[in-house]
């Protein structure tokens, strides 16, 4: 009898310029996608394509994160394998900054056979002529049960490295606008990427006893902090689809967020917890309202919690994995 033939798994090279030491959303996406894809495909992560590994040249599909930073890999793949799928995942800086003016990022958009945005508003940021090859895949995380939270005060948490795109100054200004007797405590988690940011965080902490800068924390305690907080604050001015938002939603923690495309695409156009980008006074007012109505079933905090619950289904791991594998399977089909 002839031996049964074994169809080898499709090989995927997942390129991400951000590797583990970056500890940011792009690395978390790459790591999670590699794990999800590996159930169906042979998948590995690399900072570039091609790299020094001999198996690199045999990949069937390239999945690249970041149009500008992965541009050399995108161009090399398109030149070496013009008929093979090239999936480009667009980050916030891609959508709302780089593709507007950066030639490398624009070329990556043209070379990709498939584009991925991480929330529904991302489609509108793409050139209209390219939207036909774009797909929305919401990121996911492991759901956590809501924690029992005190009613004696309101604890807010903000998570993100201290850099310009995250607008940490909005949180610092909001902390300055709050009074110590407002019953609102703020935890700020994230590494300072320059000495000026570290100094500002330390200065705010010294002036505002209700504000703490906890610096960078590992993933597990960061998620616990989100889970235990009454509300997550997200002040970014540019965002492609923030990990921390869906992690908060999946932990039973509602969100106060800047009204930018990336956040609206995650939380919905009618979400009641937005403040205008850069407006610390609005953020402080929302925090006060959350605190003042904390024990009311029809208060702002309760409304935010309900609104987040209605979005939670978008961020389930099973949905993300199914959408991702369906995209790769579709990309492999002959045109």
Each PLM stretch: what is its role?
Residues 237:
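Aromatic "clamp/platform" in nucleotide-sugar-dependent glycosyltransferases that forms part
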Residues 254-257:
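Short hydrophobic beta-strand element within catalytic cores of glycosyltransferases
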